[in-house]
């Protein structure tokens, strides 16, 4: 059984044709691409996700070398709205992320086993955005804390330096506390996609070791998707069992 190595994790198609994004992922040698919509928990329209699923079914006729899966990222203002949105979206997606930053949302996300990723917990914070309690919850519930590379590509000058510093804060914290961590592209346009080798080089420039790059870019995405395919979902995509 072939083991997949190149994951385009959390690639957004809110404002771009999903087929165009999938073809771009194929051109850059990705083997698995998770196409996502960003949805507001308080104003959730589940038909948006159903549309994405139908688009992905059609994509399979045009893209053969990339396994394309549906996902979503929830943005919420309250923990209650987040929990309700998780309940409605979880059965439809292979990847469920929550946009972090607000301490109460960070905590609610890592408290819920149905959540795969807590994205950018540092948003709006002068530090990595995780306290001792949130770290313990992430380890206990096996919720991955995500490093969002797109937040680097959309910044310059002092804002870019700030973002690099927050990623390094998270890396240092992760080395001490050993909580689940992964890396996502977060691209919202095909032009924001970069090759897997470029992802690896970028992480190494920020101080990641080879073993950390492999663990966060290959082993973590594979485990997330394999677990969800086996345990959580009614919607299935032919070939997902070949995740390795």
Curated annotation (Swiss-Prot):
Which residue ranges traverse the bilayer?
Answer: none
Task: Check the record and name the InterPro entries matching this protein.
Answer: Pol/histidinol_Pase-like (IPR016195), RNase_P_comp-3_arc (IPR023539), RNase_P_p30 (IPR002738)
User: Which Pfam families does this UniProt record tie to the protein?
Assistant: RNase_P_p30
Single GO cellular component term:
ribonuclease P complex
GO BP term, example: tRNA 5'-leader removal
Catalysed reactions listed for this entry: Endonucleolytic cleavage of RNA, removing 5'-extranucleotides from tRNA precursor
On the tree of life, the source organism's domain of life is Archaea
Listed A to Z, the keywords are: Cytoplasm, Endonuclease, Hydrolase, Nuclease, tRNA processing
Q: What does this protein do?
A: Part of ribonuclease P, a protein complex that generates mature tRNA molecules by cleaving their 5'-ends.
Q: Which HAMAP family match?
A: RNase_P_3 (MF_00756)
Assembly description: Consists of a catalytic RNA component and at least 4-5 protein subunits.
Q: What is this protein called?
A: Ribonuclease P protein component 3
Which species is this UniProt entry from?
Methanopyrus kandleri (strain AV19 / DSM 6324 / JCM 9639 / NBRC 100938)
């Amino acid at each position: 059984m072939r083991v997949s190595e190149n994951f385009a994790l959390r690639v957004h198609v809110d404002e771009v044709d999903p087929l165009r994004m999938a073809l771009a992922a194929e051109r850059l040698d990705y083997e698995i691409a998770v196409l996502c919509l960003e949805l507001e928990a308080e104003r959730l329209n589940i038909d948006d996700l159903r549309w994405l699923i139908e688009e992905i079914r059609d994509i399979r006729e045009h893209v053969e070398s990339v396994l394309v899966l549906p996902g979503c990222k929830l943005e919420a203002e309250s923990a209650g709205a987040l929990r309700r949105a998780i309940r409605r979206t979880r059965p439809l997606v292979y990847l469920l992320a929550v946009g972090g930053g607000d301490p109460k949302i960070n905590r609610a996300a890592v408290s819920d086993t149905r959540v795969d990723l807590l994205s950018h917990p540092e948003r709006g914070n002068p530090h990595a955005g995780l306290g001792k309690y949130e770290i313990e919850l992430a380890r206990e519930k096996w919720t991955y804390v995500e490093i969002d590379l797109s937040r680097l590509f959309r910044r310059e000058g002092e804002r870019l330096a700030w973002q690099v510093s927050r990623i390094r804060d998270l890396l240092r914290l992760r080395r001490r506390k050993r909580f689940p961590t992964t890396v996502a592209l977060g691209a919202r346009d095909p032009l924001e996609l970069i090759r897997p080798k470029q992802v690896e080089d970028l992480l190494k420039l920020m101080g990641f070791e080879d073993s950390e790059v492999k663990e966060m870019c290959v082993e973590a995405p594979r485990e997330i998707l394999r677990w969800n395919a086996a345990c959580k979902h009614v919607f299935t995509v032919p070939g997902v069992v070949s995740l390795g």
